[in-house]
Amino acid sequence: MAKAPITDKRKPAQNGLFSAEKLYLLRSSFARIDAQSEIAGLMFYQKLFTLEPSLQPLFHTSIDLQTRKLMNSLHYIVATIENPNLLTPALEAMGRRHVAYGVRKPHYELAIRALLETFGQILGDGFSPDIHEVWREALCFVAESMKNHRN
């Protein structure tokens, strides 16, 4: 999957979800997170399983494979977030798969929390309140789209 391009802050946003500035913050911060993708993925799962140990048995593949799947999903989300007509059906399909794995609606907030904590650790002082907020908005959009899948 292609890396998400860095958006010019001056270019107008093409949707109502995020301003061009927010897209820039999302994509530029993700580029820094992606540079440490293996660490970020492992850190995320460690945090998730610490928050809710009962989730660990839902994962039937190696943590390395899960990490790659997570980062590939984040790549796609970051690359397509300005096109909800493309992104939403993919998220709904992912939501259906996650239901089959045993994921329930309350688990999404735990995943958001674990991701935000992970991003904060990876980015350090670079995880500004604005970057935190844009990631929270993006992850909430992702979670809502996944939870609202059509059976």
Predicted segments with their positions:
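Globin-like tetrapyrrole-binding proteins
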Residues: 2-151
